[in-house]
């Protein structure tokens, strides 16, 4: 199929808005400029729309296999398409875990059969993610593993992490870490701060995360491994990563939209839709995360999309599972909060959600250039609408942002040159 995307505006390398047309043939961008329709082309009128590279989210929980009541590869990828994402990376905390070549091959086939967008599957670092025995990295890489992580739990022993890093480095693969020292969790369900004290809840201290990162960056230096920090959340963690980068250690980090937008003082009552891991931290932590993103300490934004059933989230704050959904709301939330207010440029936000994650993991995506894969998202920056969790394509409706009015909604998504979402409907 050939498309000519007409009359939209793109961003130059300096952030200037310019009107350009884009010709897509098959999976590839063939031309960008002032173009006329050719025979057989379908014209997409993008007048008044921002034409962005397809968004990239390298931290998503699709729950399949084993958690299909919460989400599936099909429903999660539909949610991604609606949110403007063309590439997502699926975490391995499923049942069974993708810890063998056979399980990874099954997962790759399932992705091919049911996904609307590109899904990059993580493999687990340890068998069943219990931290005792390392998986066969080489076999998993051959079967399609994108990188290695035990996300959802931290690798508790330095020896296991060091061996994993050495093996990953030998295969030119990344170790992606959920940073949490179990001995410092203390049964917590929210951040250790004023909110936890006021509500009589066990709190998770900031040191639980930062001490793990401090250990791991030194191991990564010794192993010469690409080490990536998931969902960084504390000011101390930002300081550790900043110092590690200054020392030349190959470390990258991501931050989730909710940690940029909220702190624990924003939690209304005991609403479990504000419960995630890591938890919403203090105001100073949120400010440090924003500063770290802007100065390059933190590399990109990832949603940590974590769907749960309504029944699960109706439990108490102590008992309800951690996690919120984010694929369908991330761009408009961040655009409204940071770009419309003038704190960030549009280019900064788009880079954090496209080229920056691609560069961090050497992926050939995230650019609008001739010859590139045609991953393209059309966004109506002026479209203002209230978030409605009942309209989500994800099975999960666990969001703290329901009914919030925001601007900057994706209206069409092309993945590898195919229209996979058009406002109001999924295209398969």
UniProtKB/Swiss-Prot annotation:
Keyword terms of this UniProt record: Hydrolase, Metal-binding, Pyrimidine biosynthesis, Zinc
Named cofactor requirement(s): Zn(2+)
Residues that coordinate or bind Zn(2+) 1: 59, 61, 151, 304
Pfam families according to UniProt: Amidohydro_1 (PF01979)
Pathway involvement of the protein, from the record: Pyrimidine metabolism; UMP biosynthesis via de novo pathway; (S)-dihydroorotate from bicarbonate: step 3/3
Entry's cofactor comment: Binds 2 Zn(2+) ions per subunit.
Gene Ontology MF terms: allantoinase activity; dihydroorotase activity; zinc ion binding
GO term, biological process aspect, one: 'de novo' UMP biosynthetic process
InterPro entries: Amidohydro-rel, DHOase, DHOase/Allantoinase_Hydrolase, Dihydroorotase_CS, Metal-dep_hydrolase_composite, Metal_Hydrolase
Gene3D superfamilies per record: Metal-dependent hydrolases, Urease, subunit C, domain 1
Positions of substrate binding: 61-63, 93, 277, 308, 322-323
Keyword Transmembrane helix: no
Positions with a binding annotation for Zn(2+) 2: 151, 178, 231
Catalytic-site annotation from UniProt: 304
UniProt KW Phosphoprotein keyword: no
Family: Belongs to the metallo-dependent hydrolases superfamily. DHOase family. Class I DHOase subfamily.
Name used for this protein in its record: Dihydroorotase
Organism field: Bacillus pumilus (strain SAFR-032)
